[in-house]
Amino acid sequence: MGKVLVIDLNICNGCYNCQVACKDEHVGNDWSPIAKPQPDTGQFWNKVTDLERGQVPKVKVTYMHSICQHCDDAPCIPACNVEAIYRRDDGAVIIDPDRCRGNQLCLEACPYEDVIYFNDSLNIAQKCTFCAHLLDDGWTEPRCVDACPTGAFRFGDENDPEIMALVARAEPLKPQLDVKPRVFYIGLPKPFIAGAVFEPDVDECTEGARVTAQKVGNGKVYEAVSDSYGDFWLRDVEPGEYTVLVEKKGYLPQKMGPVDANADINVGDIAVWKA
């Protein structure tokens, strides 16, 4: 039965346990015919990257995980001219370390970043194996999943109802590639529009203001309400340009735009005055 991995970026706290566990499992350990030892440095088969988003003081951090996607239509498999790459019955894509001849065609074929690495010392390509050697030994999950303290990593059978429910909430990385990956993400970063509302006459934060962003072109609307600090966050908006309207009963409406939300943006402090 095929395996899938779901990574929930919303609850990942950036502890790096998954990255460390991967190194601990593979550095200095020969798991042939699944994998030869990973080098001490230069390779991260589960690479954590801190994505700092927005502008001060409206900043969010997303901990992104780069890992082999174990695609059902993996471009690396036909690219290898010595047939060193194969897919197991459980869906894991493996580079046979004994058959690999170091031609690096798989590195060129892979459409994802920081997935396949080249080991100069061994003259072979290497990557995540879903810890297939552990699965064959009776483990139910790879080391990275076992090491995750928050439950951000979930691994299991693709037909398991609990896993299916997670996959239904998740999405693949770069879906336009249509390579049918077996790794899914919940909470992939999408743009936000943030700011703060205040009353300059009394130098106070404005709570309860309704902030509406309307996309230029298709008219799609996102709404939020300012909190006790006057802050508002319009999350997961479609990339594009927006007009932003701030309204509160008893106050003059304030409109701004176009706001470029092709990336996360802090529109700053918006002043409102009583009508």
Identify what each model region corresponds to:
Residues 181-183, 260-275:
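Extracellular beta-sheet/turn segments enriched in Thr/Pro/Gly and aliphatic residues
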Residues 206, 229-243, 249:
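Short Pro-Gly-centered beta-turn/loop motif in secreted/extracellular proteins
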Residues 70, 99, 234-236:
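Short, flexible loop/turn segments at beta-strand junctions in immunoglobulin-like
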Residues 216-231:
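Short, acidic Ser/Thr/Gly-rich low-complexity loop/linker segments typical of extracellular
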Residues 30-67, 77, 99, 107-198:
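Flanking helices and flexible, charged tails adjoining ferredoxin-like Fe-S electron-transfer domains
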Residues 191-193, 200-217:
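Short, ordered, surface-exposed loop/turn motifs in non-cytosolic proteins
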